Amino acid sequence: MNVESSTLIALKRQVAAMERRAPVGKAVRVATGHGDIDSALGGGIARGRLHEIFAAEQGDAGSATGFAGMLSIRLGGGVVWLREESAVRGGGHLHGPGLVEIGVDPTRLLLGFLPDPLSVLRAAADVVRCAGVGVAVIELHRDLKVLDLTASRRLALAAEESGVAALLLRIAATPVASAADTRWAVRSCASQPLPANAPGHPTFDLELLRQRGRGADGRWQVEWNREQAVFTSPTPSGAVVAVPARRPAAAPIPLRRAG
């Protein structure tokens, strides 16, 4: 049995366990908490749809990853995060303490590592069809021939049928034609320090590049409020602290992985 097959078997077994849990709510759209963004989206980010998240530049990869994690929290349910093994070798593991810091529950996060982009897409098609999954994050790096319009349509149709939110996280990649409901560009931004000069809330520059069926787009600077698990506008302040594009290594959080 090859690595891809054994990983998929383990992944399907653990996803099946997710499906036995309480189902995700039936709301079609979930508010982000940021009024202007929710207005542009017609009420919020849609479940049962494919959404693309692009790191605007290579140095914005951490911010784009954080945004995907935060959207997963807003959308609710168990999260299956699929990555290429080369992403781990090239950029390291997901920063467990950082995910916990923004509010991700490690017990509701399942990581799947696949040997190549095609394997990631095959696994994603299976995961997105599982109605018991809340969110599938499909992380792919570089421009890829296998991720064409047809491949994105498969993911979009699977999401529509199951109600799972599929977040296609693209690092060091150029946007191309796709069946995604929304497409976002994420840029790193400075955060406002909290009282006593404590580190501020994560802050991003978000740009809605396109939205299927709606002409609205826009660009906003937003903060993530972990306590309320919502996006808000930054509180004006005279001082800012820079948010590093990449965090230093830290002790790993025990995140579940398939395989």
Question: What is each stretch, according to the model?
Answer:
Residues 33, 64, 91, 120, ...:
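Helical mechanochemical/support elements of P-loop NTPase systems and associated helical scaffolds
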Residues 37, 53, 109, 136, ...:
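Conserved RecA-like P-loop NTPase ATPase core
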Residues 58, 86, 173:
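Short, glycine/serine-rich, charged loops/turns that create anion-binding
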Residues 51, 80-82, 110-112, 167, ...:
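Hydrophobic/aromatic beta-strand patches that form the interior of the parallel beta-sheet core
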Residues 77-134, 139:
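Conserved inter-motif catalytic segment of the P-loop NTP-binding fold
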Residues 113-190:
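P-loop NTPase motor core
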Residues 1-81, 92, 98-107, 214, ...:
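Detector for small/aliphatic-rich hydrophobic stretches
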